[in-house]
Amino acid sequence: MKKTLLTVGFVLSCFSAGMQAQIALVNPVPQQVKAEGGMLFDAPKTIKTFSDKGRSNSTAAKTLTENCNVQAKGAYCVTIGVVGDKATKKYDKLVPKHAEGYYLSISKKGAVIVGRDENGLYYGVQTLLASMSEGKLEVCTVTDWPDVPFRGVVEGFYGTPWSHEARLSQFDFYGRHKMNVYIYGPKDDPYHRGHWRVPYPEKEGLRIKELAEHAKRNGVSFYWAIHPGVDIKWNNEDRDALVAKLEQMYKLGVRAFAVFFDDIWGEGTKADKQAELLNYVDDNFIQKKPDVAPLVMCPTEYNRSWVNEKKGYLRTLGSKLNKSINIMWTGNTVVHCIDKEGTDWVNERIERKAYIWWNFPVTDFVRDHITLAPTYGNDLDIADKLSGFVSNPMEHAEASKIALYGVADYTWNMKAYDFKKDWEKAIHELLPGNAQALRTFALYNKDLGKNGHGFRREEGEELKELAADVNSGKPSAETIRQLSEKLEQLGVSCD
């Protein structure tokens, strides 16, 4: 049968039209899909895995077997491996050369998943599982990789921190949607900010350990952030206290670290001192441990509207900070969508690709609102200009997942990103048993209202024409009927 390369638009139109292209169930949208004319078969009831001996203990293998019924004989065979493994060596040339990329082949006889690395293999497994989620599989091959290297969430909002259980649930969600970073930086954790020198008490430390372990099981790097700028002294004593705190976190299983200098004044804002401290941490802690991820820092001047060009804060960081250290950036203002011109502007000053801290769907500046809006407004041609992209969510962890679903899709495959279709898919996945009620409720809970940042979202689009007719003073009977029906639906959705 003739193979055809499915465009992403076709794949998503299959989903929205109710057709059974199973790959359309996958989020993020894959980069390339070759389908055998839409040939479908029943998803297997049992599977068995084939791999190199040591691969069976990998996160990918465990995820596969934990989500499927495993049987040694007569089951659907899923062959898994990473480039270089003997079991999948003949497929190595088909695997994209991008970090975290993977190749997936699905046929009636079995499936093959080969990752460029461990994360790539894990993401291939997630694609297979998502494809099976409605009881069918499609004969196809998937060649896939992420656009942005680091993708995920920074818990950096003011207000009530997420509960321990909410964070665990978030990591499961990130893993399914191929996000690889979570940065722990709740402003109300005293051991992160106000008492940053003080070690975590045993009970709180064990909770951090559990978070780090659970994140790892979902392919997520758990970044623990420290915020010393409020009262740091820039002396050896404070420098050693900071490194000692990081060592404590390392012993708890944390393997990724960030240092924040945001929202501070006075002595802690000096760029040369920040660079000196961070280079010391990088040289004497991060680089000494081969299993630790690159250091991330949040600068004091973290958006364009706050930059003082005469003082040269950003240029000092750019020239003095080790090039392996990532620098966060919120855009042209504190709450702003990310555009190409703005990323070019900051990248030239910091002498590296910006690590975006996007303040959406956070609502700590309008705490009487929630936003269930889709993720949109960021340019679609900036993937090669970013080192990372993390979203700052609401204090409402579950409600944040609609936007985070979009962040995962956007950062994985920007050029194919369609925020309207993505939003519909998010609603369907997050509340499949009552998706229509969630959709109705979300339609009228998107906008943030008037706020000091001037950041607004479209809301109630489906009512605009009806409202205009009513406001004309002479609404038709049909308008009144439709408006009454929609208001009744809204009332039911709120129950």
Q: Would you name each region that the model predicts?
A:
Residues 416-495:
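C-terminal functional modules
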Residues 245, 252, 264-420:
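Catalytic-core regions of glycoside hydrolase
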Residues 11, 20-108, 134-142:
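Acidic, contiguous N-terminal accessory segments
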Residues 49-56, 80-85, 114-116, 156-158, ...:
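Structural motif
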Residues 1-4:
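Positively charged n-region of N-terminal signal peptides that target proteins for export
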Residues 7-16:
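Bacterial N-terminal signal peptides
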Residues 25, 91, 95-241, 245, ...:
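Feature activates predominantly on carbohydrate-active enzymes
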Residues 183, 258-260, 390:
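Conserved beta-strand positions in the central sheet of alpha/beta enzyme cores
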